[in-house]
Amino acid sequence: MATIQVKGQPVSTVRVEGNSRPLNGKSDVPLLLSFPHSGEHYPDDFDTNSELPFEILDFPNDKYVDELYQARSGLDLLSIHANFPRTYIDVNRHQHNIDVNMMKNGEEWYGRIHPSGVKTGTTLFWSKTKEVFDIYSRKLNHIELKQRLAQCFVPYHQLMTYYIEQIYQNHGKAYVLDCHSMTQFDGKLRGRKQRPEIDIGDRHGQSCTPEYTECVADVFSSFGYDVKINGRFLGGEIILRYGWPEINQNILQVEIRRDLY
């Protein structure tokens, strides 16, 4: 398993919790939970701007979201967790979503470059937090960024692929909840509009069947929450990569507003 150094000690970049029986072909429930942004282990080589307060750097992370789904253990569900913060590398971005301006000789990056989110600093390797605060005071080099891809991005998606395939082979179908949090209001660039309490993204029906979307939305609505489907967040790289309702492989991105907890 790939590791990062945290306070001089090796820490696995990704962990799997819950029922491991898919390894033996005996999974009971065709559901997997994904927590790509709840990591709290800051790598020693995360050389951030010394003037940036930690609470600002940590702000984009989906803190405590994995704790909201604690009932998963009683249901014996599998879950996959990134142990690193999303500002270090964001596994919910495409690997070619690169801002060349934050790198030395960025035009020489090894892969294709298809940036989105440059203005807000929210590409694969974040350059800003809260839209205005610079994460780095220097240009990054290719070696350190490619290392992050190899140690963090690749293992996360390898495990996602493996367990989804195991579930699918066992049941002929697979369901995934990609679990996130969001602030109460949009950022300044979007006019600070209030967001719904629960925002469920399915890329307008491209990542899962309507029945799955409606089922999850109805559960939240039954508890009195204001629920929107594709209201503010349609879903990122994870549901784009793994959502194939045409073969009954279904995934939703669920955003829970932070002020609720």
Each language-model region and where it sits:
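N-terminal catalytic or cofactor-binding beta/alpha core of small enzyme domains
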Residues: A2-V176, S181-L260
